[in-house]
Amino acid sequence: MCSRVPLLLPLLLLLALGPGVQGCPSGCQCSQPQTVFCTARQGTTVPRDVPPDTVGLYVFENGITMLDAGSFAGLPGLQLLDLSQNQIASLPSGVFQPLANLSNLDLTANRLHEITNETFRGLRRLERLYLGKNRIRHIQPGAFDTLDRLLELKLQDNELRALPPLRLPRLLLLDLSHNSLLALEPGILDTANVEALRLAGLGLQQLDEGLFSRLRNLHDLDVSDNQLERVPPVIRGLRGLTRLRLAGNTRIAQLRPEDLAGLAALQELDVSNLSLQALPGDLSGLFPRLRLLAAARNPFNCVCPLSWFGPWVRESHVTLASPEETRCHFPPKNAGRLLLELDYADFGCPATTTTATVPTTRPVVREPTALSSSLAPTWLSPTEPATEAPSPPSTAPPTVGPVPQPQDCPPSTCLNGGTCHLGTRHHLACLCPEGFTGLYCESQMGQGTRPSPTPVTPRPPRSLTLGIEPVSPTSLRVGLQRYLQGSSVQLRSLRLTYRNLSGPDKRLVTLRLPASLAEYTVTQLRPNATYSVCVMPLGPGRVPEGEEACGEAHTPPAVHSNHAPVTQAREGNLPLLIAPALAAVLLAALAAVGAAYCVRRGRAMAAAAQDKGQVGPGAGPLELEGVKVPLEPGPKATEGGGEALPSGSECEVPLMGFPGPGLQSPLHAKPYI
């Protein structure tokens, strides 16, 4: 038995360390619950040695070029598969069929050209399918019809020129942005429950009413960066809208109250980068629930009819997005100034409703504007001039009259002789002549191309937001969609950090996430605790200014629940490394104790054999003849002490030998038991 210990020890060590060493593919990181991150691995195929109990597999940015029928064999429990940012050009028929439990599939940023009826065969439980940023030109009719449980479908940034009818009764989000779909046929969307529809950057000139006839549950509509010349009339019928994005439709030069009537539920409105010179005066009446307004990069004419805007923003609960880019264009005395920084007097409103006679040596020049009925009159003191001094003759102030006809680039957009043109995605831009600078060439340069002393308001850091909400007493869901949309850097991976603010352990925990995730659930938290969560780009060097978003959330008290959401686990294999190491140390200690016991037992058995007359290793000539020499009393025997055998066993020996001639057998020693 003891001789087998050296053979069993390596086997026991292999069994103890096997799951931690052999269960994770090379170049990957494995963590619980059953999540494999292959972020540093480079290979043209999917790793083959993935543990069969894997729930989440992340192989983004691995250089994968092809998939075959056996790429995902032996992974029946896989629920989340991230293949984004690879070089996959085609998907074999039925390649995902072994993944019967797959719910999330991310193929963003590959080189796919076509989607067939067999591409997603067998994915009956698929809920999220991301196909954005590919080269897809053709989708066969019925390619998604078998995906009965699909909730999100993203096809943005492809090369689609036509779209087959979509019959997805459970779909909640559909993103078709930035394709070449110049028109969408009525009835093409059989998605009665869709909540968010994104049609940005398609080049649409109008929206057909039949397109929205079945969208009874629409809350979020994005039609930005198109060629719309006015607010589509069909929008008035979407009374459930809470978010509307019209940004980048540079041909829209006017917002009429009747265009937006019936949208009382609206909470977020984006009318930035249009050609607006004014805004409807009754925004609070039109949108009583409005929380966020974006109106940046419009050529506003900051005269009296617009004087209500600043006080309304400051006094209401509405947040103005990008206030540093919401500036005046006209008149020249206000050009380039922040709209929120203007006082009532800066808008050139008449002091009274009647003409006042004020002694002055200069002629009175009034702005050709009408007094807003909602503004209270302001009385002038006798020492104050009635109006501002006339503008320099080189640039005459514009008058308030009929809004010009919609054009690609509205007239008088650029000041001081600047040339207006449309930039990328139809954004207005001005080419300024020598000596002038600014968004609309409103600032004059001095000698030596030094800017004029006009105060320039420093641009505050951008505010990126996170949506954090509790999922269970031990988990928080972090919404990354707004952060990804608002970030100005190219994101490949994200760093998510969190810490417990209400507990004794406030150590920072860091996770690495792919940039393709729209949300992430942080698990293994403490119930009834407040956590701080931050997200930032992952990369060497310092985080760019304004690219870190943080938020706080509180987990609810503990409740009995049998459901735990399947999410990605923490990065790092520290628990998997500690457990095998402790097992190895314990096995080594047990082996050492067993070996020592075997050695002592062997020596004791050898001593017993010698006492019984067996020939031992140290037998003399007389013992070979069958004659045993009597024990001679040694020095220790005369002292009455015990004598130690060569084998190490302690024995009792007689105090005196037999006086005979030595023919009788001596008294044998009795070893201790």
Swiss-Prot record:
Glycan attachment residues as annotated in the record: 101, 117, 273, 500, 528
Domain called EGF-like: residue spans: 405-442
Tagged with keyword Repeat: yes
Intracellular or extracellular location(s): Membrane; Secreted
GO molecular function, one term: transforming growth factor beta binding
Modified how: N-glycosylated. N-glycan heterogeneity at Asn-117: Hex5HexNAc4 (minor), dHex1Hex5HexNAc4 (major), Hex6HexNAc5 (minor) and dHex1Hex6HexNAc5 (minor).
Main location: membrane
Taxonomic superkingdom: Eukaryota
Pfam families with a match to the protein in the record: EGF, LRR_8
LRRCT domain segment(s): 298-351
Region: Disordered, residue numbers: 358-404
Regions that span the bilayer: 576-596
Signal peptide: 1-23
Subunit structure: Interacts with TGFB1, TGFB2 and TGFB3.
Protein name: Vasorin
Organism: Homo sapiens (Human)
